């Protein structure tokens, strides 16, 4: 059984939700590549921090609730429920004040750690 508290994907999402971007330096490679929809892909830890800052500014209650993690060698796959409220515009989505719930899959490939 996987100890969710120890997986990189869980720690990364929790740090992002909390606005603890200093933790990204420990968890992510400086040249991390994150593939994301809506033009939110990043190619460095600094860019990833910037996207999270913008996301939290638009959705202050943004949360990633990890439902399940499967680990296979250097791969961590997570099933995540993302919730929040669009208080301001972000990634082309207007700030409507409406809350949302999205099911998400996150797949990470770990290197050097």
Describe the residue ranges of each PLM region.
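C-terminal and inter-domain tail/linker signature
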Residues: 1-112
């Amino acid at each position: 059984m996987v100890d969710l508290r120890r997986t990189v994907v869980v720690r990364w999402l929790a740090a992002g939700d909390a606005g603890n971007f200093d933790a990204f330096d420990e968890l992510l490679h400086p040249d991390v590549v994150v593939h994301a929809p809506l033009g939110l892909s990043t190619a460095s830890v600094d860019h990833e921090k910037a996207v999270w800052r913008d996301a939290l500014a638009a959705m202050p209650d943004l949360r990633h609730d990890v439902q399940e993690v499967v680990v296979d060698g250097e791969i961590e796959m997570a099933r995540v429920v993302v919730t929040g409220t669009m208080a301001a515009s972000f990634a082309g989505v207007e700030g409507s004040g409406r809350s949302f719930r999205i099911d998400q899959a996150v797949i990470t490939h770990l290197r050097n750690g």
